[in-house]
Amino acid sequence: MLVACQMAFAQSTRNVGDFSSLKVYNKINVTLIGSNESKVETEENDPDIETVNKNGELKIKLSPAKILSGDQVSVKVFYEKLNDIQASQGSSISSSEELDANMLSLTSNEGSKVNLNLDVSKLNIKTNSGGEIKISGTADNQDVVVNSGGKYFGKEVKSQNTKVTANAGGVAEVNVSE
């Protein structure tokens, strides 16, 4: 006798409106996916995952009860255009796709990680308090600030002009052609 079981995991899609700035908190793992619509997809319909879009700035965070539970939370963020990305409080942001933008600001704080492949004209990097940013791709110009144990791994970024400021144990690895 053969018995087949199939588990279905309910996914929840939230239409969050247009945004160009993304801020992620509370150890949430985000996968970025370029799309012709802006939405957030969660593994389940969890009211403890808060998505707030105010004036084009989308914040994704957990309710206090969910933070204390210690559960791992992953979401997919579908975006049309991004020019500002911030990871805070142990969160992570990554994508298997190349992110294209004219200007992009990336920030990683408080043990968070950002791992992206980019094609941008102007890239602003800021990392501190143990935050990590690992980037590959191209950026015509980079402005990098690393503080208080922040790390920027940008050796795989082809750049023409780069300015680096490192303070208080900050580490920056860059590749510059001019």
Region spans (language model):
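Intrinsically disordered, low-complexity terminal regions
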Residues: 1-178
